Each structure stands twice: as structure tokens, then as C-alpha cells.
Amino acid sequence: FIHDSLYPSEKEDISKAASFIHHFDQLLYQVNTLNESNVIIFTNNVEESVKHLRAFKLSIIERHLTSEMKIHLTPTFINHMVNELEEYLLILSYLKQGKTPPIFHELHHHLIWLVDASGHAGAINDRLDGVEKRLKEKSSTFTKHFEQFYLKAVELAGYLRTNIHKFPALK
């Protein structure tokens, strides 16, 4: 998303984004060669790469907020990308120790992915031609539903502070 959304004048960031694409493609290629003897080293390398990508995206948000760069993505959309990277770093923190990540409460995932889904539904709506009235209505409805589900998840996650992890509203 970032590479194709940067203004052509953002040459340095375009180059960095292309470098990240190439680097992560290389990591993906290495997945087929993983075994018990190299998986931890690989995971540590991935973690380091993800941290660099996170820093790059945060620098874009910072410069976007201060009007020092031009990109066709909102700071909020990029922030959602950072949230995804942080979730991946959480998973990697277990994998690099040879541990299986725990199963987090479903609301943990709702708080990450519902806001992301809403952003994607909104982006789809924004890219649809105005003559696609039915599709735009459906997309707008999806956006609203995801936003409503997210707000509900925020409140339900607050209920978890009672140490009750299952209650009727979660069904």
C-alpha cells in the first residue's frame, strides 16, 4: 500500500518502501527452508525487520501529521498498519523463544481487526465509481457495521476488567 500511495516526489521513501518489499519477499522465500535448527534465528531476523518497518511507518505518520510529506493514505490508515505490525511483534516474541503464542481473548482480536476492516471497507467505498450506487451502499453499510462492532468491542473489553471473561453479550 505505502509504495504505491506515495507521491512521486517522495523519492527517498519510495526507495525505502521498495527495499522493504524486496527484503520481505526474500524472507518469504526463506520460509520453505525452515527447520528446527534455523527457525529461531529466522524469527529473530524477521523481528528485527518488522521493527524497522514499524519505525518507517511511524516516520511516515509523523511527517504526514506535520505536513512534511505527501501520501495518498491517511495517518489513521497507516496507524492501523502499525497496529498490525505490533500484533505480529507480540506473536514473534513467543515464537523466538520457541513457544506457542497464547490464545488471546477474542476481544483482543476484535479491537485490532474491526477497525482495520472498517478502514478497508471505507477505502473500497471511496474507490468505487459514483455510478456503482448499490455497491457503494453495501460498502458504506459494511463500514458502519464494522465501526459499530468496534465500538461494542471497546465496551465489552472494558467489562473484562471484572475478571469475567464469558458473558451473554459475547455470544
Question: What kind of feature is each model-predicted range?
Answer:
Residues F1-K171:
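Surface-exposed peri-terminal alpha-helical interaction modules
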